[in-house]
């Protein structure tokens, strides 16, 4: 995503935060963010040490996602019986482009139909049926929804993913911690966190599991209609039987996961991680 020189969402956020601080009567010599800090974030020289999280970038959002829908209708019959049937299916993807959310979907399969019979000049019958199968899969988001987090998450707080290769080879304790975690993303990133953000929506979507929802609905009714006008003008008799069945269930895989707050150092102009703190997350 965008890494223009001397621009970042974080730098813009911190600059505006300082302005609000001054407007509220804060002292110039006590700004929350120094000019050097803002420069480091604006330079984009190390987006892992100085993150600028853009929830709307192509790192996280697809340019487009698919919705597929197909349906078919069948009808026919003769003077004794007529029938109609409709079959439809749709599947909806998701615009999130990372972690388990890449596999999010909603789908529905529906079949409905009816048959009308003429049994005699005074008796007719009907049968109606409908069946719907609905399913959805989504990544767990324990920290409210992605879009809610996009509105409230501070862009400078946490780098969602940090390369393992940035850990100093001599930082044995940090390497041991990383070796013990089961959540190394794509074989090369660990999940970032901080004491203020023990977990976050990115970690959720990468590592906290999934939820699969299914529902089944079935409706059926059938009846007979009798014309008894030969007995008494306007007299008729109707019978009906109906069944309405529905069931729903969810299968959820809920995982806890560790995030790591790095301690950075600079050796000969190169940023390296010399320590990690999981802040109690596991």
What annotation goes with each model-predicted range?
Residues 222-224:
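Short, hydrophobic/aromatic-enriched beta-strand segments in well-ordered soluble domains
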Residues 90, 95-108, 130, 138-140, ...:
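Small-side-chain secondary-structure face that scaffolds active or pore-lining regions
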Residues 1-215, 220:
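Membrane-proximal, glycine/serine-rich, low-complexity loop/turn segments characteristic
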